[in-house]
Amino acid sequence: MESVQSAQPLLFPQPTAGDLPPRDIVHKPARRATRPGLSVCVLGSGSGGNCTVVRLTDAKGQREAVLLDAGFGVRRTTAKLHEAGIGWRHVKAVMLTHLDRDHFKPSLTRALVEHRVTVHLHHWHLDELAHSRGTQPLFEHGLVEPFNTGIFVPTPGVTATTTRLQHDRQGTIGYRLSTRFGDIGFATDLGHAPRKLIEHFAGVDALCIESNYDERMTTQSSRPSFVNRRNLSDSGHLSNEQAYEAVQQIRDASPHGNPRHVVLLHRSSQCNHPTKVRRVFERDPQLIKRVTMTDQRKRTRWINVKPLRQVHRSQLTLAR
């Protein structure tokens, strides 16, 4: 299951009466990675918690991992990591997009301190972290690494380039992770996709971006009107249509047909459905083959991130 070389590219589920999870959602323990490379696995994504693992494996089979958001409690995070073949000993850093409770659980503090995991977040979010209950040990042990929008290195071999995005009062952070094996773009909880984000993610090999809601389901939902107004606003979340448009713009701005993989995050359980997402993205038959839909309860398979090979002039047959 974990070897993406033998798996089909990335498929959406077919609609069923029971709304079964997508085929690329798995729950069996992962096999140990031995080939050097870059891979990504979403442990779960939605309003009930968000956590994504980016894994680097060297030629000796040694692994290091970085978490993008940490929105599950200690037990669930530990279990999900184990299920994906990752232990806390592999986790070197947590990179937070923002501090909503579905993206960071302060109860993880003890595990982060025990395993000496650094927490990277924007200066705008630093005060909120400092006033979150139980997080003081992170500061006392020197594990908090605030950054201004720009570039930093969360762990050797990974360079993070950041951009601030509009979401609620303090915004959220979009990350581009660059390694010798390829680049990953990651953005969630953004009300719209500005031009700077399109440029920021141009050329990434894997794109993780939210596809939160179906607009019609949202306007017809029983949620309070102020919640719907917030989600639909430029400071809320991306709809399926907005996500599709953002992906197409990033593809247009990218060379060599990138991104090779598109991972859709943070699908609303009340105001979205896999079939709604699929109907939007199947407009492009080539794009839908590259798409993985995430799930709140179950992780995705490991997605191996490999840059698309550049076509050399010697390989081209020029029309005369």
Task: Walk through the language-model features, giving the residues of each.
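C-terminal regulatory/interaction regions
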Residues: E2-D24, H273-R320
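Cap/insert and terminal regions of metallo-dependent hydrolase folds
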Residues: R195-D295
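Active-site metal-binding motif and surrounding structural segment of the metallo-beta-lactamase
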Residues: R63-E64, G73-L121
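Conserved catalytic scaffold of divalent metal-dependent phosphoesterases
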Residues: G157-T162, Q166-H167, R176-I184, L190-H192, ...
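Metal-dependent catalytic neighborhoods of phosphoester/phosphodiester hydrolases
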Residues: K105-H115, A130-R133, N272-R279
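Active-site neighborhood of phospho(di)ester-bond hydrolases with catalytic His/Asp-centered motifs
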Residues: L67-G71, V91-D100, H120-H123, G185-D189, ...
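Conserved beta-strand hairpin/beta-sheet module of binuclear metal-dependent hydrolase folds
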Residues: E2-A84, G171-D189, A206
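Metallo-beta-lactamase
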Residues: P21-D24, H123-F181
